[in-house]
């Protein structure tokens, strides 16, 4: 079969129009290649993805890299297939870009198999209908906002409250406890942070259990709008062909939408609310519907969500919310108390915090813990103005227990051992439930509150109390 060539007819930023001979139009989503000497000296080094058909013999494409240096009339090769990325175990420990090329200077990936990045969501009959919790070994998450296997979790937090450390601990725990793999998609975030994550994962020994796919802030919008799909295809291979329970991290899902809106106007679509693309909900749905549990395995995804101007009603975060099963909200006030992970126990939610899924005992203890913490929050104004002495005996007891709960919700992480100096702890769910049940029931009212800070189980807290007393 002879190769199909076209030629560039116009270049509009990240969008490029290509003319073909009549009857030879490449289908939508096909990858075309063109030589851009401004990138490097390789031939056909720039990938264009077909987005629209313009009449009989022209297509409009989105570029996956810089278009500086392209000229009209240049030859464009139709590869005859979608953008495809290498999948399988060879991708572990590697950093790939949106088109599946390694960018870590460690040689070619040499994977046996490739997947196209646009794939159908699993058919309804293949999806698993069983709802079950996915234990992370992190007390505050497992107790108050448990993750669902095959669910989608939104991770909210400002700068510097510990999103990355929490993500790394989850990667570590899933690798060690479940033997599972993780895929990390860096979508439109800082290159420095991507590099830091890679270095830290190397140091903490979790790199060989994860594949990293980066399309950072400096990349053109085409790459940022597709890199999440590339990472998802790698995760789907582990789920569908190896029957694994995979963890997929997307940092940051807002940038996926942002990139789509940058390209949308160039493609000639009329913008909708707040200047976003009219296809916002469709694009988000195509990505999110592929993240699910099937009868073979599951993809559980944790997505960091940037909220523009802290406005939760902005169309981008609001569209993402529709897909979430649980939210983990990181709070600066809690981080300021030195309590890590700085998860807000009253703001974080989960769809499966339901006695029918997690059981009556777990549910009732979670609700009691939230009640005590909420009561403490309500009393804080009184304490600030009048002091502790003005509280009733009953309220004093609530405050004392709440402060113990607050401290017991912290725990040392494996990936932060270098900073904290204390070994990381993975806490089994039954130990978490037992510990909080005893605190709420008042079994440890005589134990000083600092004994509960940065420990794993309740037994460790009591050990620590003995040391403090000695």
UniProtKB/Swiss-Prot annotation:
Residues annotated as binding ATP: 157-164
Localization, UniProt: Cell inner membrane
Keyword Ligase attached: no
UniProt signal peptide: none
Topological relation to the membrane, as annotated: Peripheral membrane protein
E.C. designation(s): 7.1.2.2
GO cellular component: plasma membrane; proton-transporting ATP synthase complex
Name of the molecule in the record: ATP synthase subunit beta
Species: Geobacter sulfurreducens (strain ATCC 51573 / DSM 12127 / PCA)
């Amino acid at each position: 079969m002879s190769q199909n060539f076209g030629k560039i007819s116009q270049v509009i930023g990240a969008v490029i129009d290509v003319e073909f001979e009549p009857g030879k139009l490449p289908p939508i989503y096909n990858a075309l290649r063109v030589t851009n000497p401004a990138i490097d000296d390789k031939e056909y080094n720039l990938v264009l993805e077909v987005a629209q058909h313009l009449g009989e013999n022209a297509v409009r494409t989105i570029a996956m890299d810089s278009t500086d240096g392209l000229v009209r009339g240049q030859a464009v090769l139709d590869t005859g297939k979608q953008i495809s990325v290498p999948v399988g175990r060879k991708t572990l420990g590697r950093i790939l870009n949106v088109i599946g090329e390694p960018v870590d200077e460690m040689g070619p990936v040499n994977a046996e198999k490739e997947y196209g990045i646009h794939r159908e969501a699993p058919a309804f009959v293949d999806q698993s209908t069983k709802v079950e919790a996915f234990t992370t070994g992190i007390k505050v998450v497992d107790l108050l906002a448990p993750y669902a296997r095959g669910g989608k979790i939104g991770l909210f937090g400002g700068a510097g409250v510990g999103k990355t450390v929490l993500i790394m601990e989850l990667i570590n725990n899933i690798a060690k406890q479940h033997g599972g793999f993780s895929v990390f998609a860096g979508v439109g975030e800082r290159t420095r942070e991507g590099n830091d994550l890679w270095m830290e994962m190397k140091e903490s020994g979790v790199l060989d259990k994860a594949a990293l796919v980066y399309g950072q802030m400096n990349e053109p919008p085409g790459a940022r709008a597709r890199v999440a799909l590339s990472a998802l295809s790698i995760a789907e291979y582990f789920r569908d062909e190896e029957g694994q329970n995979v963890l997929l991290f997307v940092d940051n899902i807002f940038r996926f939408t942002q990139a789509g809106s940058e390209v949308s106007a160039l493609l000639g679509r009329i913008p909708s609310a707040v200047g976003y693309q009219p296809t916002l909900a469709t694009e988000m749905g195509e990505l999110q519907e592929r993240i699910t549990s099937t009868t073979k395995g599951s993809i559980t995804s944790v997505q960091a969500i940037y909220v523009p101007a802290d406005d939760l009603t902005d169309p981008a975060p609001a569209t993402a919310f529709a897909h979430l099963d649980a939210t983990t909200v990181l709070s600066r006030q809690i981080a300021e108390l030195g309590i890590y992970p700085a998860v807000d126990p009253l703001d974080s939610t989960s769809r499966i915090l339901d006695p029918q899924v997690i059981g009556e005992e777990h549910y009732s203890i979670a609700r009691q813990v939230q009640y005590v913490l909420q009561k403490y929050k309500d009393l804080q104004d009184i304490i600030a103005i009048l002091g502790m002495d003005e509280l009733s005996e009953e309220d004093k007891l609530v405050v004392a227990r709440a402060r113990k709960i607050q401290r017991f919700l912290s725990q040392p992480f494996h990936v932060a051992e270098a900073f904290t100096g204390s070994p990381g702890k993975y806490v089994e769910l039954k130990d978490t439930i037992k510990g909080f049940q005893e605190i709420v029931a008042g079994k440890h009212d005589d134990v000083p509150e600092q004994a509960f800070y940065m420990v794993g189980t309740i037994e460790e807290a009591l050990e620590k109390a003995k040391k403090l007393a000695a």
